[in-house]
Amino acid sequence: MGPSSLLHPAFASSAGPTRRTIDLADCRERLVRHRIYGLVNSAPRLRRFMESHVFAVWDFQSLLKAMQQRLTCTSLPWVPTLDPEARRLVNEIVLDEESDELPEGGSASHFELYLDGMRAAGADTGPIDGMIEALQAGRLPQVEQPAATVGEVVAEAMRASGAPNAARDFVQKSFAVIESGSTHGIVAAFTYGREDVIPDMFRSLVSSLASRDTAWARFHWYLERHIEADDEKHAPVCRRIMARLCGDDPAKWAEASRVARECIEARIALWDAIAADIETMPAG
Protein backbone atom coordinates (compact mmCIF):
# COMPACT_ATOMS: atom_id res chain seq x y z
CA MET A 1 0.00 0.00 0.00
CA GLY A 2 1.54 3.26 -1.13
CA PRO A 3 1.54 6.48 0.87
CA SER A 4 -0.99 8.07 -1.48
CA SER A 5 -3.59 5.49 -0.43
CA LEU A 6 -3.45 6.83 3.11
CA LEU A 7 -5.07 10.11 2.02
CA HIS A 8 -8.73 9.65 1.23
CA PRO A 9 -10.43 12.40 -0.80
CA ALA A 10 -14.06 13.05 0.03
CA PHE A 11 -16.52 14.70 -2.30
CA ALA A 12 -19.66 16.41 -1.03
CA SER A 13 -22.15 15.59 -3.76
CA SER A 14 -24.68 18.01 -2.32
CA ALA A 15 -22.27 20.93 -1.95
CA GLY A 16 -20.65 21.38 -5.35
CA PRO A 17 -17.00 20.66 -6.20
CA THR A 18 -15.80 20.57 -2.57
CA ARG A 19 -12.75 18.40 -1.96
CA ARG A 20 -11.41 17.64 1.51
CA THR A 21 -8.86 15.20 2.84
CA ILE A 22 -8.06 13.97 6.32
CA ASP A 23 -4.35 13.23 6.62
CA LEU A 24 -3.82 10.34 9.04
CA ALA A 25 -0.85 8.79 7.28
CA ASP A 26 1.52 8.80 10.26
CA CYS A 27 -0.73 7.22 12.88
CA ARG A 28 -2.37 4.92 10.35
CA GLU A 29 1.02 3.61 9.32
CA ARG A 30 1.91 2.87 12.95
CA LEU A 31 -1.36 1.00 13.35
CA VAL A 32 -1.17 -1.21 10.27
CA ARG A 33 2.50 -2.03 10.98
CA HIS A 34 2.00 -2.73 14.69
CA ARG A 35 3.94 -5.64 16.20
CA ILE A 36 0.72 -7.26 17.45
CA TYR A 37 0.08 -9.01 14.14
CA GLY A 38 3.39 -10.86 14.23
CA LEU A 39 2.85 -11.89 17.85
CA VAL A 40 -0.42 -13.70 17.21
CA ASN A 41 1.40 -16.85 16.11
CA SER A 42 -0.08 -19.65 18.23
CA ALA A 43 -3.48 -20.89 19.34
CA PRO A 44 -3.11 -19.67 22.95
CA ARG A 45 -1.92 -16.26 21.78
CA LEU A 46 -4.78 -15.86 19.35
CA ARG A 47 -7.27 -16.81 22.05
CA ARG A 48 -5.77 -14.17 24.33
CA PHE A 49 -6.02 -11.61 21.53
CA MET A 50 -9.67 -12.43 20.88
CA GLU A 51 -10.59 -12.17 24.55
CA SER A 52 -9.68 -8.47 24.52
CA HIS A 53 -10.47 -7.61 20.91
CA VAL A 54 -14.06 -8.84 21.18
CA PHE A 55 -14.92 -5.70 23.17
CA ALA A 56 -13.77 -3.58 20.24
CA VAL A 57 -16.00 -5.67 17.97
CA TRP A 58 -18.98 -4.91 20.21
CA ASP A 59 -17.92 -1.26 20.39
CA PHE A 60 -18.00 -1.15 16.56
CA GLN A 61 -21.67 -2.09 16.57
CA SER A 62 -22.43 0.59 19.18
CA LEU A 63 -20.74 3.30 17.11
CA LEU A 64 -22.70 2.16 14.08
CA LYS A 65 -26.01 2.35 15.94
CA ALA A 66 -25.10 5.83 17.20
CA MET A 67 -24.50 6.85 13.60
CA GLN A 68 -27.82 5.35 12.53
CA GLN A 69 -29.65 7.18 15.32
CA ARG A 70 -28.14 10.46 14.16
CA LEU A 71 -28.75 10.03 10.44
CA THR A 72 -32.08 8.18 10.37
CA CYS A 73 -35.30 8.23 12.35
CA THR A 74 -35.29 5.39 14.90
CA SER A 75 -38.05 6.69 17.18
CA LEU A 76 -41.81 7.05 17.05
CA PRO A 77 -43.57 8.79 15.44
CA TRP A 78 -41.44 8.45 12.33
CA VAL A 79 -40.45 11.61 10.48
CA PRO A 80 -38.15 11.96 7.45
CA THR A 81 -34.60 13.03 8.23
CA LEU A 82 -32.84 15.82 6.36
CA ASP A 83 -30.52 13.78 4.13
CA PRO A 84 -32.20 10.82 2.37
CA GLU A 85 -28.91 9.77 0.73
CA ALA A 86 -27.06 9.55 4.06
CA ARG A 87 -30.06 7.70 5.49
CA ARG A 88 -29.89 5.08 2.75
CA LEU A 89 -26.13 4.69 3.01
CA VAL A 90 -26.03 4.13 6.76
CA ASN A 91 -28.94 1.68 6.62
CA GLU A 92 -27.04 -0.36 4.03
CA ILE A 93 -24.11 -0.65 6.44
CA VAL A 94 -26.42 -1.60 9.32
CA LEU A 95 -27.98 -4.35 7.21
CA ASP A 96 -24.58 -5.92 6.58
CA GLU A 97 -23.14 -5.47 10.07
CA GLU A 98 -26.21 -6.31 12.15
CA SER A 99 -27.73 -9.11 10.07
CA ASP A 100 -25.22 -10.43 7.54
CA GLU A 101 -25.95 -13.57 5.54
CA LEU A 102 -24.11 -16.65 6.78
CA PRO A 103 -22.43 -19.06 4.36
CA GLU A 104 -24.58 -21.94 5.63
CA GLY A 105 -27.77 -19.87 5.55
CA GLY A 106 -29.43 -17.65 8.10
CA SER A 107 -28.27 -14.29 9.44
CA ALA A 108 -26.19 -12.91 12.31
CA SER A 109 -24.44 -9.75 13.36
CA HIS A 110 -20.69 -9.60 12.94
CA PHE A 111 -20.42 -9.46 16.74
CA GLU A 112 -22.27 -12.77 16.99
CA LEU A 113 -20.03 -14.21 14.28
CA TYR A 114 -17.00 -13.19 16.32
CA LEU A 115 -18.42 -14.87 19.43
CA ASP A 116 -19.00 -18.04 17.41
CA GLY A 117 -15.38 -17.90 16.30
CA MET A 118 -14.21 -17.48 19.89
CA ARG A 119 -16.22 -20.45 21.11
CA ALA A 120 -15.01 -22.65 18.26
CA ALA A 121 -11.43 -21.70 19.11
CA GLY A 122 -11.84 -22.31 22.84
CA ALA A 123 -11.44 -18.66 23.85
CA ASP A 124 -13.01 -17.43 27.09
CA THR A 125 -16.24 -15.55 26.38
CA GLY A 126 -17.11 -15.14 30.07
CA PRO A 127 -16.32 -11.42 30.40
CA ILE A 128 -18.02 -10.33 27.18
CA ASP A 129 -21.02 -12.58 27.88
CA GLY A 130 -21.21 -11.13 31.39
CA MET A 131 -21.15 -7.59 30.07
CA ILE A 132 -23.93 -8.25 27.56
CA GLU A 133 -26.06 -10.02 30.18
CA ALA A 134 -25.61 -7.13 32.62
CA LEU A 135 -26.60 -4.60 29.97
CA GLN A 136 -29.63 -6.65 28.94
CA ALA A 137 -30.84 -7.17 32.50
CA GLY A 138 -29.89 -3.76 33.90
CA ARG A 139 -28.08 -5.42 36.81
CA LEU A 140 -25.66 -2.60 37.57
CA PRO A 141 -25.99 -1.69 41.27
CA GLN A 142 -23.09 0.79 41.17
CA VAL A 143 -24.85 2.94 38.57
CA GLU A 144 -27.58 5.40 39.51
CA GLN A 145 -30.06 4.88 36.72
CA PRO A 146 -31.63 6.68 34.91
CA ALA A 147 -29.27 9.54 35.81
CA ALA A 148 -26.20 7.71 34.48
CA THR A 149 -24.96 8.28 30.96
CA VAL A 150 -24.78 5.37 28.54
CA GLY A 151 -20.99 5.51 28.82
CA GLU A 152 -21.19 5.16 32.60
CA VAL A 153 -23.56 2.21 32.30
CA VAL A 154 -21.21 0.49 29.84
CA ALA A 155 -18.16 1.24 32.01
CA GLU A 156 -19.80 -0.37 35.04
CA ALA A 157 -20.93 -3.40 33.03
CA MET A 158 -17.38 -3.88 31.76
CA ARG A 159 -15.90 -3.47 35.24
CA ALA A 160 -18.37 -5.91 36.79
CA SER A 161 -17.75 -8.52 34.08
CA GLY A 162 -13.97 -8.40 34.42
CA ALA A 163 -13.22 -6.89 31.03
CA PRO A 164 -9.50 -6.15 30.47
CA ASN A 165 -8.50 -2.61 31.48
CA ALA A 166 -7.19 -1.76 28.01
CA ALA A 167 -10.48 -2.82 26.41
CA ARG A 168 -12.37 -0.70 28.93
CA ASP A 169 -10.26 2.35 28.06
CA PHE A 170 -10.80 1.79 24.33
CA VAL A 171 -14.57 1.49 24.65
CA GLN A 172 -14.80 4.52 26.91
CA LYS A 173 -13.10 6.62 24.24
CA SER A 174 -15.77 5.58 21.77
CA PHE A 175 -18.59 6.43 24.14
CA ALA A 176 -17.03 9.80 24.85
CA VAL A 177 -17.29 10.49 21.12
CA ILE A 178 -20.87 9.18 21.03
CA GLU A 179 -21.89 11.39 23.95
CA SER A 180 -20.15 14.46 22.52
CA GLY A 181 -23.23 15.24 20.46
CA SER A 182 -21.22 15.72 17.27
CA THR A 183 -22.69 13.78 14.35
CA HIS A 184 -19.66 14.37 12.13
CA GLY A 185 -17.43 13.34 15.05
CA ILE A 186 -19.29 10.04 15.42
CA VAL A 187 -19.10 9.40 11.67
CA ALA A 188 -15.38 10.29 11.67
CA ALA A 189 -14.75 7.79 14.48
CA PHE A 190 -16.59 5.08 12.57
CA THR A 191 -15.14 5.94 9.16
CA TYR A 192 -11.47 6.58 9.89
CA GLY A 193 -11.14 4.81 13.23
CA ARG A 194 -12.92 1.64 12.09
CA GLU A 195 -14.02 1.00 8.51
CA ASP A 196 -11.02 2.60 6.84
CA VAL A 197 -8.31 0.79 8.85
CA ILE A 198 -9.91 -2.58 9.60
CA PRO A 199 -9.20 -4.23 6.22
CA ASP A 200 -5.43 -3.67 6.48
CA MET A 201 -5.36 -4.74 10.13
CA PHE A 202 -7.31 -7.91 9.40
CA ARG A 203 -5.23 -8.83 6.35
CA SER A 204 -2.25 -9.20 8.65
CA LEU A 205 -4.22 -11.52 10.93
CA VAL A 206 -5.48 -13.56 7.98
CA SER A 207 -1.89 -14.14 6.90
CA SER A 208 -1.04 -15.31 10.41
CA LEU A 209 -4.00 -17.71 10.42
CA ALA A 210 -3.49 -19.11 6.93
CA SER A 211 -1.99 -22.41 8.10
CA ARG A 212 -3.80 -22.72 11.43
CA ASP A 213 -6.15 -25.44 12.64
CA THR A 214 -9.72 -25.68 11.32
CA ALA A 215 -10.90 -24.55 14.76
CA TRP A 216 -10.18 -21.05 13.49
CA ALA A 217 -12.36 -21.44 10.39
CA ARG A 218 -15.24 -19.36 11.73
CA PHE A 219 -12.94 -16.57 12.90
CA HIS A 220 -11.07 -16.69 9.61
CA TRP A 221 -14.34 -16.30 7.71
CA TYR A 222 -15.26 -13.33 9.94
CA LEU A 223 -11.98 -11.62 9.07
CA GLU A 224 -12.35 -12.28 5.35
CA ARG A 225 -15.93 -11.04 5.37
CA HIS A 226 -14.96 -7.81 7.12
CA ILE A 227 -12.11 -7.19 4.70
CA GLU A 228 -14.41 -7.67 1.72
CA ALA A 229 -17.29 -5.57 3.06
CA ASP A 230 -15.25 -2.74 4.56
CA ASP A 231 -12.68 -2.33 1.81
CA GLU A 232 -14.97 -2.57 -1.20
CA LYS A 233 -18.23 -1.16 0.14
CA HIS A 234 -18.45 0.31 3.63
CA ALA A 235 -15.36 2.55 3.75
CA PRO A 236 -16.20 4.35 0.48
CA VAL A 237 -19.81 4.76 1.63
CA CYS A 238 -18.70 6.19 4.97
CA ARG A 239 -16.46 8.71 3.25
CA ARG A 240 -19.43 9.86 1.18
CA ILE A 241 -21.46 10.35 4.35
CA MET A 242 -18.53 12.22 5.90
CA ALA A 243 -18.37 14.57 2.94
CA ARG A 244 -22.09 15.24 3.02
CA LEU A 245 -21.95 16.08 6.73
CA CYS A 246 -18.90 18.35 6.64
CA GLY A 247 -19.43 19.90 3.23
CA ASP A 248 -17.23 22.98 2.90
CA ASP A 249 -16.98 23.71 6.63
CA PRO A 250 -13.29 23.81 7.71
CA ALA A 251 -14.23 23.65 11.40
CA LYS A 252 -16.15 20.40 10.91
CA TRP A 253 -13.31 18.87 8.91
CA ALA A 254 -10.82 19.92 11.61
CA GLU A 255 -12.93 18.30 14.33
CA ALA A 256 -13.42 15.18 12.25
CA SER A 257 -9.65 14.95 11.75
CA ARG A 258 -9.01 15.34 15.48
CA VAL A 259 -11.55 12.67 16.43
CA ALA A 260 -10.26 10.28 13.76
CA ARG A 261 -6.69 10.66 14.97
CA GLU A 262 -7.70 10.15 18.61
CA CYS A 263 -9.58 6.97 17.69
CA ILE A 264 -6.60 5.53 15.82
CA GLU A 265 -4.33 6.39 18.75
CA ALA A 266 -6.81 4.63 21.06
CA ARG A 267 -6.58 1.53 18.87
CA ILE A 268 -2.78 1.67 18.97
CA ALA A 269 -2.94 1.89 22.78
CA LEU A 270 -5.21 -1.18 22.83
CA TRP A 271 -2.81 -3.07 20.55
CA ASP A 272 0.13 -2.01 22.77
CA ALA A 273 -1.58 -3.44 25.86
CA ILE A 274 -2.61 -6.71 24.19
CA ALA A 275 0.87 -7.11 22.69
CA ALA A 276 2.50 -6.58 26.09
CA ASP A 277 0.21 -9.24 27.56
CA ILE A 278 0.86 -11.71 24.74
CA GLU A 279 4.62 -11.21 25.05
CA THR A 280 4.45 -12.81 28.51
CA MET A 281 3.22 -16.05 26.86
CA PRO A 282 5.35 -18.72 25.15
CA ALA A 283 6.05 -17.97 21.49
CA GLY A 284 4.31 -19.98 18.79
Predicted regions and their residues:
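Non-heme di-metal
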Residues: G2-G284
